[in-house]
């Protein structure tokens, strides 16, 4: 997958309020849930949206504000999901960037978009490797 890069650099942590993070998460996931491609995928997997939002708010608050409230392994818990596609990752990123572009905080937009790009690339690469490795491994030839 080739995701268009963003500009280098970033403003660092502590650049937004907790209310900004809450608004980002709630607005973004409302878009995700309404999206024709992503909505059905997420709706089939997320049972408790309030709990999921709380977790995501802690995650993004840790990244954007340095709160260190999030404790978890986001990539590992998503790797087992069947059916993810490159188009889904690209759509997720496009919706995220649309949301951050409307947040009114340029420093937050840059930091959040950079983090989302890194995560999307890392997650997609790990997901592909896991998909290739499912099943019996091919042994190396003897000798």
Language-model features: locations:
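Core of compact, soluble alpha-helical bundle domains
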Residues: 1-143
């Amino acid at each position: 997958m080739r995701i268009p890069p963003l500009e280098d650099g970033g403003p660092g942590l502590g650049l937004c309020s907790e209310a900004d993070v809450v608004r980002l998460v709630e607005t973004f996931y409302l878009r995700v849930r309404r999206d024709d491609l992503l909505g059905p995928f997420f709706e089939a997997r997320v049972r408790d949206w309030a709990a999921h939002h709380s977790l995501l708010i802690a995650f993004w608050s840790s990244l954007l504000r340095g709160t260190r409230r999030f404790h978890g392994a986001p990539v590992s818990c998503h790797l087992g999901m069947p059916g993810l596609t490159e188009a889904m990752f690209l759509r997720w990123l496009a919706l995220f960037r649309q949301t951050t572009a409307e947040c009114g905080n340029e420093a937050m937009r840059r930091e959040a978009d950079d983090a989302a790009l890194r995560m999307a690339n890392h997650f997609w690469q790990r997901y592909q490797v896991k998909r290739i490795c499912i099943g019996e491994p091919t042994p190396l030839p003897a000798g």
